Amino acid sequence: MNPNQKIITIGSISIAIGIISLMLQIGNIISMWASHSIQTGSQNHTGICNQRIITYENSTWVNHTYVNINNTNVVTGKDKTSVTLAGNSSLCSISGWAIYTKDNSIRIGSKGDVFVIREPFISCSHLECRTFFLTQGALLNDKHSNGTVKDRSPYRALMSCPLGEAPSPYNSKFESVAWSASACHDGMGWLTIGISGPDNGAVAVLKYNGIITETIKSWKKRILRTQESECVCVNGSCFTIMTDGPSDGAASYKIFKIEKGKVTKSIELNAPNFHYEECSCYPDTGTVMCVCRDNWHGSNRPWVSFNQNLDYQIGYICSGVFGDNPRPKDGKGSCNPVTVDGADGVKGFSYKYGNGVWIGRTKSNKLRKGFEMIWDPNGWTDTDNDFSVKQDVVAITDWSGYSGSFVQHPELTGLDCIRPCFWVELVRGLPRENATIWTSGSSISFCGVDSDTANWSWPDGAELPFTIDK
């Protein structure tokens, strides 16, 4: 075969191979089209891949993700309808407290991006519980954590994150600029209350579902402040208590009734020898009970209960098992302020059951260390110091801090009663731990159960100082 013939032969073979390859590709395309037509022939919709839709349904954010796999729509999440949290049930009967959450914020923050916080609290809707907290606009183990022992600054903000998680920039939601705050859910939306501004002119900003609805100006120009725990919603109305005036003497105390973020009624308490700060409130059979901090002259805790018309009653827990810190040794109580070691105090809570009371308190009389729950079967009305149950939560050798109540409604739990719960702040750093330049806290929480519970210590557990402190 001469060279020309070889060239012609090779060219012919190449052309033949190219034609065969082209025919195979065309056949493949026809096959895929036919297969797709068969699968979709009986359907009347067009498949869309990776379509992400966010809807707003009854004031509750619902997130749907549609992913088309072989023309089958897989939907994650489901519609959540709104309800009205009635708050008409009674508190559940309980015999003790089961550990619910522990976020280990300080331990995780030694290496991870975790906010410097204080004043954490928990509040629940009919769908979920969330941890709320006041940040310092800084992260642990970072230079901006220096000086965060200060209570009130323009860098503080109310934020929230999923329950039990360490609060970080990656899981937290901004709620309000605030150095004092409260939040609660009425079944249709979140009400947040954030107080910020100068001591002589602070303003409370009310938001409903994230939108500003009302503001309340300091009426005494003496550090307007609120609960540092959840407000209470009953039959569509939410209630909170604010204080304005001296922390070491008679001040002004107001109850606010709020509907969808708007104040519909308010009253000032007539309580000349009482002192109410940082109240821990809960619903019980349609009324609201608040147990508060007396920073003026009481080592027992003051209370105020009121109905939806704001008709109220006031008093002090009578038990000789004293609930504040600092406090004297347990002894004879009083239904008026117990003035021994009555100055100063710490945010706390109690739950009333008839004439009995569950008292949450630090284990130390003088320092914010340890925590325990005590059941005094006659402590709401009687002045003796006899109790029948004591449950340890944090050992006296470990730091605690603020504590407060929160509840889970039947709409969340499926129970026929309101479940009582509480949280404890575990403060670390300044002013007690001088090896650090910062102040922050983690938290634990418990819920009431009528079954077995444990006596133990669930401390913060972080090893200090951090790298930034050295």
Curated annotation (Swiss-Prot):
Residues the record lists as binding substrate: R118, R152, E277, E278, R293, R368
Catalyzed reactions: Hydrolysis of alpha-(2->3)-, alpha-(2->6)-, alpha-(2->8)- glycosidic linkages of terminal sialic acid residues in oligosaccharides, glycoproteins, glycolipids, colominic acid and synthetic substrates
UniProt-annotated stretches for the region Involved in apical transport and lipid raft association: 11-33
Disulfide bonds: C92-C417, C124-C129, C184-C231, C233-C238, C279-C292, C281-C290, C318-C335, C421-C447
Residues spanning the membrane: 7-27
Keyword Disulfide bond: yes
Short name of one Pfam family: Neur
One BP term from GO: carbohydrate metabolic process
Needed co-factor(s): Ca(2+)
GO terms of molecular function: exo-alpha-sialidase activity; metal ion binding
Stored CDD domains: Influenza_NA
Stored InterPro entries: Glyco_hydro_34, Sialidase_Influenza_A/B, Sialidase_sf
Regulation: Inhibited by the neuraminidase inhibitors zanamivir (Relenza) and oseltamivir (Tamiflu). These drugs interfere with the release of progeny virus from infected cells and are effective against all influenza strains. Resistance to neuraminidase inhibitors is quite rare.
SUPFAM superfamilies (alphabetical): Sialidases (SSF50939)
GO annotations of cellular component type: host cell plasma membrane; membrane; virion membrane
Subcellular location: Virion membrane; Host apical cell membrane
Topology within the bilayer: Single-pass type II membrane protein
Range of residues in the leader sequence: none
Sugar attachment sites: N44, N58, N63, N70, N88, N146, N235, N434, N455
Oligomer and partners: Homotetramer.
Miscellaneous comment as given in the Swiss-Prot or TrEMBL entry: The influenza A genome consist of 8 RNA segments. Genetic variation of hemagglutinin and/or neuraminidase genes results in the emergence of new influenza strains. The mechanism of variation can be the result of point mutations or the result of genetic reassortment between segments of two different strains.
Comment block on domains: Intact N-terminus is essential for virion morphogenesis. Possesses two apical sorting signals, one in the ectodomain, which is likely to be a glycan, and the other in the transmembrane domain. The transmembrane domain also plays a role in lipid raft association.
Family: Belongs to the glycosyl hydrolase 34 family.
Protein name from the UniProt record: Neuraminidase
